[in-house]
Amino acid sequence: MNKQKTRRPELLAPAGNMEKFFTALHFGADAVYLAGKNFGLRAFADNFTLDEIKFCCGYAHEKGKKVYVTVNIFADGRDLEKLPDYISALDNCGADALIVSDAGVMQIAKSVAPRLPLHLSTQANCTNARAAEFWRDAGVSRIVAARECGFDDLVQMAALKDCELEIFVHGAMCMAYSGRCLLSSWLSGRGGNKGECVQACRWEWQVSLTEREHPDKPLFLNEDERGVYIMNSRDLCLMPYLNRALETGAVSLKIEGRMKSAHYVGTVVNAYRRALDACLTGSFSKSVSDGLLNELKKTSHRAFTSGFLFGKDFDETENFFTSKAVADGNFVASVLDWSDGVAAV
C-alpha cells in the first residue's frame, strides 16, 4: 500500500470568478485554483484582479483553506518581460502555490519568489516517475499528473520522496495531450497554449477522400447525416472508482471547470466532498456512488469515462456521435441568504 495513502487528500476545486470561489469553499473544497487576468490558460473566464486574489487568499486562509494561482501558459519573450513583477505580486497576495508549466516561468518564479511553492501543471505532460523526479529536482513540490496516466504510473509517481501528486478526478478532457494540440491556433488563430482554445476538436468534422485529378469531387465518409465527431473527448468522472483513485497515493483530487457555472462548481464539489468523506470513514459503497453520480449528471456534461486510470480503448474515451453537453436537471436559482426558514434567491 502506498505510504501516502494515510494522508487526508485535498479536494481541489476550480474558481473562474468570485461567485465560483465562494461556491467552491461553501460546498466543501479544501483548496481552489484560479487565475489572474493574464497567463492562466483560461482567457475567456472572468478571472481575478490582484486585489481580488489578495482578498481570496485572506478569506481562504481564515477558513483553513488554500489558494493556488495558475501561471501555466507556454510563454514567449513578451510574456517573460511582464512575469517577474506579476509573480512577485502574487507572492505578496499570499498565494499558497503557483501552477506552472513553462521552465522559463518556473525559473523566474524561483528567482523573484523563492519561498512560493511550485506545482507542475498538467500542461507539462508528466506521465511517469522519472519525469516527476526531474521536475522535483528542478524545484517543483507537486506534480499535477497528465490525465493520460494509468494507475501503476500514478502509484510510482506518488511514491517519489519530497514531491506530492495531484490527479484529476472530474471534468472535461482533451483529445490530445494537454498543451500539444494546435487545431485552435491553425483554424482560428487563437492559441490553446495562451488560454484561448476554441475547442475545434468538438466541431462537426467530415472525413473525405479526394482523387488527385478531381479535387472538386470529394467522397465524404460520414458516420451519419450529421458527420462524425472523431476527436470529441468524453468527460472524466472517477466517482465510481474514487477508492481506487485514493489508492494511487495522490494528496490532491482535482476538479476541472474554471469556465463552468457556479451551479456546476457547487454540485460537483458537494458530490465529491461527500464521496471523499465516505471513503475516509469506510462508508463508500456502490449505492452511495450511484446516488452521487446521479447528482453529477444534473450538471452540464458529456458522456462520462474513467479516462486512462485502468487503460481504455479509444472508443471508451471519445464520443463519436455528438459533442453536445447534456444535463438531467435544470438550474433554477442561486440561494443568496437563508433566514427564519425563508430563502432569498
PLM segments and residue spans:
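Beta/alpha (TIM)-barrel catalytic core signal, keyed to glycine-rich beta->alpha loops juxtaposed to Asp/Glu
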Residues: N125
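Conserved nucleotide-cofactor-binding alpha/beta core module
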Residues: A129-R130
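Glycine-rich, positively charged N-terminal anion/phosphate-binding segment
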Residues: R42-H61
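Alpha-helix capping/helix-boundary segments
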Residues: G104-V105
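Surface-exposed amphipathic alpha-helical tracts and adjacent flexible/coil segments at the periphery
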Residues: M1-H26, A31-L34, N38, C56-C57, ...
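Conserved phosphotransfer cores of two-component systems
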Residues: A113
